[in-house]
Amino acid sequence: MKLSLKDLALSIILVLGVAPPVQALSAEEWKKQSVYNVMTDRFATSKVVPHCDVKAEKYCGGNWQGIVDHLDYIRDLGFTAISISPVVEQLEGPEYHGEAYHGHRPKNYYRLNPHFGNEEDLKELSDALHGKGMYLMVDVAINHTISEYFEDDYFKNTYFDKTHIDHKCKEHCSCHHDKFPRPVPHNGTKPDHKPWKHEEHCHHGKFPRPVPHNGTKPDHKPWKHEEHCSCHHDKFPRPVPHNGTKPDHKPWKHEEHCSCHHDKFPRPVPHNGTKPDHKPWKHEEHCHHGKFPRPIPHNGTKPDHKPWKHEEHCHHGRFPRPVPHNGTKPDHKPWKHEEHCSCHHDKFSRPVPHNGTKPDHKPWKHEEHCHHGKFLRPVPHNVTKPDHKPWKHEEHCHHGKFPRPVPHNGTKPDHKPWKHEEHCSCHEDHSVHERPSAKGALEDYIQTFVETFQIDGIRFDAMGDKYRKYWPDFCKAAGVFCMGDLKSSDSLKVCDWQNDLEGLSNFPVRESAVKAFLMNNPEGIVDLADKMTDMRGLCVNPLLLGNFVENKDLPRMASISSDPATLKNAIAFVLMGDGIPMMYNGQELAMRGEEVPYNRPAIWEKGFPKRNPYYKFTSTINRFRKAMIESKDGEAFLNMQSDISIVDKRILLLRRGKVITVLNNLGSYYIHFHYTVSAEEHKWMDVLSCKSVPVQDNRQVFMVRNGEPMILYPEESAYEMGLCPSPIQLTEDYNSEGSLSINVEEAQTSKAPEQNRGFTNVLAALLLSLLMIL
């Protein structure tokens, strides 16, 4: 018998158990997985690091080698896959809510984040996972890209040679490095269409002084310092109106535009020329003797030339709301309250631009000039858009604490892209997906990245709700299963998106789930059941949605409730509810954190305790789920949506095949709850406690003790699969917390393929191969 060298090599590979390259998991195979979400910087470190100060929002020292060193912690927890935070190089520096440890400020997609390791470290993590029969999903923050640069020579000495996308972005904002930005007006508003000079839009104090359009001056010359700056050096500026409004076109005098007296807040003086008699304004006509000013607009702008009434120019809150000129309204009618006042009663006002600048001369809509955070987001003039359509939210807003307005590229007279210093947010430019060159480069990148590091799945972090048609192409280029993070609680919207991207985070169900198990929410179970029913009726395949209650951007369950029953019911729902289970690192330890950054603590500071009751509880359910999937009933269990039943509004029954998950919001202090069913079908056992359900008069009585969840499975099958010890094995010192983790581990070991074969078996197989050759 002759055997080629190729056949010999294949024979030796098969004998020695060397696996071929990992094949991409299909969507159906991902349904079998239980995913542990890891924030790389906060999970584990391979070096000695100081205490992690989460409030500082800096890198704490977690890395890929640390994950490799603690894979057994994740595997023993029962998870079969991990999802790690973005891996690419980030912009450095503490701007925009601290350092980019979270991975949302990508600088260069073709370089790895040196804080986490190098190319070999990431490959080692991938290989280590696959060696344990586990899988790797990576977060990709594509929606945070703004770069317009593609340079072939930039990637020398990187892990592969491709054109790149690099953020060549400097800090734009203020004229000097203080806490508040200085927005740059549209270049097109200057008569000569040249860029604005520094002195035309900046002031070196703590607060900016905006410069009006140059075109409003009669002589079209630049504004002088004294024409737009404070009359004296106090903390707040005094704006100077347009010179052209004076009858004689001469400069304004100091007393005409400065505070009536030297207090802490200014009183702006309107144009003298607007009075019907053209005489100077009297003190009482433009000043108010309280602590806060109420500016008085021009009397002459009112159609009837009568004095303004108090309610027309004052607001009784702590901060004034200026009233724009009535004359700018097309109909010359008085401004309505909602047109010039704050959208809601907070500490900061939202100025309303002139209505006359809109192409249709209709009133501005709420969403066009307001933002519900503490800081305002100015809305540029609609007329500057090439198509004259309304600005969309993402075109002028920034979701951080400070605004960075980004004008539309098409508004420049020469139609060239805006330069960084002209508009300047360093990230959050959403137009990258519309540029064919960038789209192609990103698709090339993700394909090469997946192949290089043997990635099994991609998660689109902070996907946003724009460019819907872009994501399927990007996922197709990756060639692996994709999970999109579409942050919306709208069932209809999420299910509609699933027509294009089958994997999505189930935010609608999550919103109901975090409230469902709270003892003080008697309607919570009903609301959760209704939301699950909605998703079932609307979505193409709800079983491919990510099922979760925590992530790096949301409050942790232990901060919402400290009740152990609530926390365990939430864990049981994540792992046994419909969809792909996805648990955020630290939930298995009931870690706290109400908001960012406090919900991102360092896991290693807890010491990876496997005796933690929530760790053991999570491990028990995960191992049961895996054993169930690998059983003869696995296909039915995996592909069946839960039959939903509600008992007395407080108990939720989710039945999938022979498995009944019993969840509740009774709380730890509720002693017992009885639920009776017929014993004809099965004799049930709770695999979490390994206690059989008692039978009375051919009826089985389920008893919910202290609000803890149950997973019911036929008693005989539980014994056969080794999920629970048989009655012969039971002892009096049975641990009430359950000793399932040990027994299931033993059962799983007996079922799983042996990965470390003995030397004798290898030698025997090798001899057999040699005999075949001979």
Swiss-Prot record:
SUPFAM superfamilies (alphabetical): (Trans)glycosidases, Glycosyl hydrolase domain
Organism: Schizosaccharomyces pombe (strain 972 / ATCC 24843)
Lineage, uppermost ranks: Eukaryota, Fungi, Dikarya, Ascomycota, Taphrinomycotina
GO BP: carbohydrate catabolic process
EC number: 3.2.1.1
Position of the signal peptide: 1-24
Bilayer topology annotation: Lipid-anchor; GPI-anchor
Enzyme active site: 461 (nucleophile)
Protein name as catalogued: Alpha-amylase 4
Annotated localization: Cell membrane
GPI-anchor amidated serine lipid sites: 750
Underlying gene: meu7
